[in-house]
């Protein structure tokens, strides 16, 4: 995109800057919604590591604090850096054109500096737990900022797969804070669930926002290969979730039943998409289901440990 085009988009964005508070702008800068949802997976990893190592949360409240704050700062930091990196294409998309780095509420230099500072501060907090937690945090940050935001996002349709690696790391951060060996198979099942779940989740979003991604020049799968291939890919990845609960028998039969029912429900909804004429409506249904799926699944993992 040339400078003239960029300036035109900047001007159009400025004319419709929404009224926001400083706190709202800060939340948008660090993508607080993403931080909050990922904090659930961090806590789940932490909680299950305590459970399977026979440890008490009351004896590890300090580690819980350092883990939640540290991982939250790391995630907020990389989201800041992503806003900085994407400031040229965000004005082209409806869902991102009101970000504070687009509207001018925060200057690019501030977003870059603030992102780096809180990212490093997050690593310091994680270091107060275990070095492995720091390593997991670094892997997640490097994958999201460098491999996804700077490299694959604007070049390859596999950008979704690459980005899903970083989104699968948070439960490992939580687990590593208690058990740095990461030797329990359930720790890696959490990683696999998060990795696989993100792909149909974000492909459904890409279908819903296909015109925006096309205008921004981002080669999402539905932009490059169309809806039919995207729907097939969504189904393949959704089906891949089906066997995973059976490798988590340590959480008991109740969890396995809940997880399997959630998987079957998602698969049934997915197959319905091949009969439905309104692909956009179906993609929204798949996206909403994926959000509920993740919340119910991870909350269930915690709840079943009480029985």
UniProtKB/Swiss-Prot annotation:
Further comment found in the protein's record: Carbon 2 of the heme B porphyrin ring is defined according to the Fischer nomenclature.
GO biological process: heme O biosynthetic process
Domain of life assignment: Bacteria
Catalytically driven reaction(s): heme b + (2E,6E)-farnesyl diphosphate + H2O = Fe(II)-heme o + diphosphate
Record's GO cellular component terms: plasma membrane
UniProt protein name: Protoheme IX farnesyltransferase
UniProt KW Ligase keyword: no
Pathway: Porphyrin-containing compound metabolism; heme O biosynthesis; heme O from protoheme: step 1/1
Function according to Swiss-Prot or TrEMBL: Converts heme B (protoheme IX) to heme O by substitution of the vinyl group on carbon 2 of heme B porphyrin ring with a hydroxyethyl farnesyl side group.
Similarity field: Belongs to the UbiA prenyltransferase family. Protoheme IX farnesyltransferase subfamily.
Chief location: membrane
InterPro entries (alphabetical): Protohaem_IX_farnesylTrfase, UbiA_prenyltransferase, UbiA_prenylTrfase_CS, UbiA_sf
Gene expressing this chain: ctaB
């Amino acid at each position: 995109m040339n400078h003239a085009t960029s300036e035109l988009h900047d001007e159009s964005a400025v004319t419709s800057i929404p009224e926001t508070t400083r706190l709202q702008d800060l939340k948008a800068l660090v993508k607080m919604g993403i931080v909050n949802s990922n904090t659930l997976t961090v806590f789940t990893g932490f909680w299950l590591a305590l459970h399977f190592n026979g440890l008490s949360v009351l004896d590890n409240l300090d580690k819980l604090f350092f883990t939640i704050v540290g991982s939250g700062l790391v995630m907020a930091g990389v989201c800041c850096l992503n806003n900085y990196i994407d400031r040229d294409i965000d004005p082209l998309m409806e869902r991102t054109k009101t970000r504070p780095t687009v509207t001018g509420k925060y200057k690019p230099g501030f977003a870059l500096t603030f992102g780096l500072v809180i990212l490093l501060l997050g690593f310091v907090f994680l270091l107060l737990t275990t070095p492995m937690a720091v390593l997991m945090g670094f892997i997640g940050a490097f994958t999201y900022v460098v491999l996804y935001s700077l490299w694959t996002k604007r070049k390859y349709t596999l950008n979704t797969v690459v980005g899903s690696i970083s989104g699968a790391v948070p439960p490992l951060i939580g687990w590593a804070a208690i058990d740095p060996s990461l030797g329990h198979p359930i720790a890696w099942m959490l990683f696999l669930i998060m990795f696989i779940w993100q792909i149909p989740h974000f492909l459904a979003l890409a279908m819903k926002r296909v015109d925006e991604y096309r205008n921004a020049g981002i080669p999402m799968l539905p932009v490059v290969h169309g809806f039919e291939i995207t729907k097939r890919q969504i189904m393949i990845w959704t089906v891949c979730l089906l066997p995973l609960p059976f490798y988590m028998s340590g959480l008991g039969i109740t969890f396995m039943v809940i997880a399997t029912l959630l998987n079957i429900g998602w698969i049934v909804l997915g197959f319905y998409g091949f009969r439905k004429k309104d692909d956009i409506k179906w993609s929204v249904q798949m996206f909403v289901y994926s959000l509920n799926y993740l919340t119910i699944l991870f909350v269930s993992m915690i709840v079943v440990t009480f029985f």
